[in-house]
Regions:
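NTP-dependent small-molecule kinase module
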Residues: 72, 76, 93, 97, ...
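Conserved protein kinase catalytic core
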Residues: 6-8, 67-68, 87, 134-136
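ATP-dependent NMP and nucleoside kinases share a basic, alpha-helical "lid"
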Residues: 46-94
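Amphipathic alpha-helical transducer elements in NTP-driven molecular machines
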Residues: 17-21, 60, 81, 100-103
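Conserved nucleotide-sensing/catalytic segment adjacent to the nucleotide-binding pocket
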Residues: 1-58
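Anionic group-transfer/hydrolysis microenvironments
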Residues: 4, 63, 130
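Conserved catalytic-core segment of NTP-binding enzymes
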Residues: 80-116, 123
């Protein structure tokens, strides 16, 4: 979703989900190539063209991936549970401390989005994003019943 969003303020806007439907979902359903120009967060504009030729499987990841535009077409929906502090720490480690204020605002917006879209309740599988028992992800997975 980060490549579809268009900046912090427009990330969960109706335009985002319209673009998502037109650029990703519609071509996928029509067995066509997916084409869009991804958003560059540092330049604050769309820059690099992306082409995915007729994918048989597509994983869409991110906060907005639980929107109805995607959800109704998804064959499997995952919910990853992670403590807010751990989540923001991971993002700041990846993207830098300079986005800390935007991330605090984003967490409020994503929480509202999750509630409005019943994201957690509509998921097929829940995954612990910070398990107490560490696993070797190269050879193990954990399955639980909700």
């Amino acid at each position: 979703m980060d490549e579809i969003y268009e900046g912090w303020e427009n990330a969960l806007s109706p335009k985002t989900f319209s673009d998502l439907a037109n650029w990703i979902i519609k071509p996928l359903l029509e067995s066509k190539s997916i084409e869009f120009t991804k958003y560059d967060w540092y330049l604050e504009k769309r820059k690099e063209r992306v082409v995915i030729n007729n994918p048989k499987v597509l994983i869409i990841e991110g906060v907005g991936s639980s929107s109805s535009e995607i959800s109704e077409h998804a064959c499997l929906k995952l919910w990853i549970v992670v403590n807010k502090e751990i989540g923001i720490s991971r993002v700041l480690t990846r993207d830098g401390q300079q986005i800390q204020e935007q991330m605090k605002k984003w967490q409020t917006r994503e929480y509202k989005f999750f509630i409005e879209n019943n994201s957690k309740e509509n998921s097929d599988i829940w995954i612990d994003g910070d398990p107490v028992v560490k696993i070797d992800t190269s050879s193990q997975f954990v399955r639980t019943n909700r």
